[in-house]
Amino acid sequence: MILSEYGFVEVGEWKLKESLRSGVTFDLHNFEKERVVYAFVVDDEAKYVGVCDNTTTTLKDRMSRYKGLQGAGTNKRIANKIKGCLERGKSVKIFVLKPESTLQYKGLNVDLVKGLENPLIEKLKPEWNIQG
């Protein structure tokens, strides 16, 4: 799987939970309180790449937005994609990349989490990410 070449590791998975409005919930076993780049993987293929969008958003916070259908329409759309896969008997795994280093450009801190999102989407072409 190409994700491992970039340093992604598996940290959890999505599960069906009919009592929730979204119909899905998640289990995380690592990186819950970290700010990361994440990917949803079905059949060893990255289907979606996203980020914890600001400096205080953790992985658990971000996954909760899909689970609770909070915020942008993207959260509902992706939750429905996850639910559809699970209903067809597929597993939807959660992988993360936590950049270790901090870069600077002329004295400015460079946000590697946000900075890696678009290049990864361009390289991996995950079908759930809206492109172009």
Segments the model singles out, each with a brief description of its role:
Residues 1-57:
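GIY-YIG nuclease catalytic motif and its immediate N-terminal context
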Residues 20, 24, 63, 132:
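Solvent-exposed, flexible loop/coil residues
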Residues 87-132:
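Structure-specific nucleic-acid interaction/processing domains
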Residues 55-106:
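Conserved short loop/helix modules at catalytic or binding sites
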Residues 19-21, 76-80, 108-116:
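Short flexible/disordered coil segments
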